[in-house]
Amino acid sequence: MKFKSLPMFALLMLGGCSLIPDYQQPAAPMQAQWPTGQAYGGQGDQRSIATALPKAKEFFKDPALVRLLDAALENNRDLRIAAKNVESYRALYRIQRAERFPTLDGQASGNRTRLPDDLSPTGDSRIDSQYQVGLVTAYELDLFGRIRSLSNQALEKYLATEEAQRSVQIALIGDVATTYFLWRTDQALLELTEATLTSYVESLAMIESSAWAGTSSELDVRQARTLVNQAQAQQALYTRRIAQDVNALELLLGSKIPTDLPKNSPLAMSALGKVPAGLPADLLLNRPDIRSAEHQLMAANANIGAARAAFFPRISLTASAGSASSDLDGLFNSGSDSWSFAPQISVPIFNAGKLRANLDYAELQKDVGVATYEKSIQTAFREVADGLAARGTYGKQLSAQSELVDNYKAYFSLAQQRYDQGVDSYLTVLDAQRELFSSQQKLLNDQLDQINSEVQLYKALGGGWSVSQN
């Protein structure tokens, strides 16, 4: 008798087995330290290491931008879609997890059948009645971990979607910030253009008066009009760009831009906090997009377990208990108890290679997941390296450009003095004025590029999102 119970004992022991391959995190395909060299200004040195980024509201110092970020996080439609996707995958996980437990259903049925006389054993027609009420339970013995594997896969996909939502949030914060700074820059460029246009118009009027007096040539007049036309074209350009910036911001916000925004602070690096130097390279592994890719990889790994388990028998147990009677009034009388027990085993014998192909597909999907995970790390490393290179060079570039603006201001002032003294023609003044305007535009655009590069670096490092927030 003891030996007869061994097969059942072995089956029960198998219930603790799993055919999911042991998961091993792929080695990160990146350097242990950030790049070094002239462009990076020694930022790859990690002797003094910071461990975390400032949170978004600590990093962005501009009160108006902080107000816009709050509005975007509340109303942005992409963020709402991402949140609904998380809820959807959570529901799918709950559905799959429920498969690991027995089901219990209430059931009631009634059946009346008339048997004609030519089919009746007695030769007389009769009506048979049968009524039944009870409970039905069903359960699949997950001896080889098929259901557990599918549940783990659903869980990892749900977790991947959660991380994807965080990625959307970080991207949204970065997009709102860069669009806001572009809007501010275009406003400054329009203001500069309008001031320059006013100066050009005044110069044109003066040259036209001089031309009537015979002291200026037609060439001087044409040159002055050319500058006026160029400034008018750029005035229209920046007016259009400001409108487009507003449209882009309102799309990101999911609502109109508030009319009572705090007063703008000067557009400079002071609008941002400091991304600490010396952050370790493995901090990238905490980026939500990389964590999402790893959860997708773990989901693919779990699916291999389900594909392997499909080669083995599936055992289902169905049982019912209740009351049955040929008379509705006697359904709950003594002696009307009924029950049934129906175990079922299904063994795959021939499927034209379907199960083998399904396993191959699952293993290939895992390989795809590994490559995707590795690429996400490499992409993140490249984004941070680009940001560090920008940080290491924009300071010198802006310093040189700012000095260039100062030199053109001096050049314009000297040219004006020499014209007033009759030493040079007004063409020299116009040339100096044009170069000054161009250098001032370039300085504003360089300031924008520097600010946006720091925002992108902050975003590339994970946007202040720490694992403890997960």
From Swiss-Prot:
GO terms for molecular function: efflux transmembrane transporter activity. It is a lipid-anchor. Induction: Constitutively expressed; the ttgGHI operon is further induced about 4-fold by toluene and styrene but not by antibiotics. A lipid is attached at C17 (N-palmitoyl cysteine). It is found in: Cell outer membrane. Keywords: Cell outer membrane, Lipoprotein, Membrane, Palmitate, Plasmid, Signal, Transmembrane, Transmembrane beta strand. Residues 104-123 are annotated as: Disordered. InterPro entries: OMF (IPR050737), OMP_efflux (IPR003423), RND_efflux_OM_lipoprot_NodT (IPR010131). Residues 1-16 form the signal peptide. One of its GO terms (cellular component) is cell outer membrane. A lipid is attached at C17 (S-diacylglycerol cysteine). Pfam families: OEP. Belongs to the outer membrane factor (OMF) (TC 1.B.17) family. The outer membrane component of an organic solvent efflux pump. Involved in export of a number of organic solvents, including toluene and styrene. This is the most important solvent efflux pump in this strain, although it can export AMP and some antibiotics. This is Toluene efflux pump outer membrane protein TtgI. It comes from Pseudomonas putida (strain DOT-T1E). The lineage of its organism: Bacteria, Pseudomonadati, Pseudomonadota, Gammaproteobacteria, Pseudomonadales.
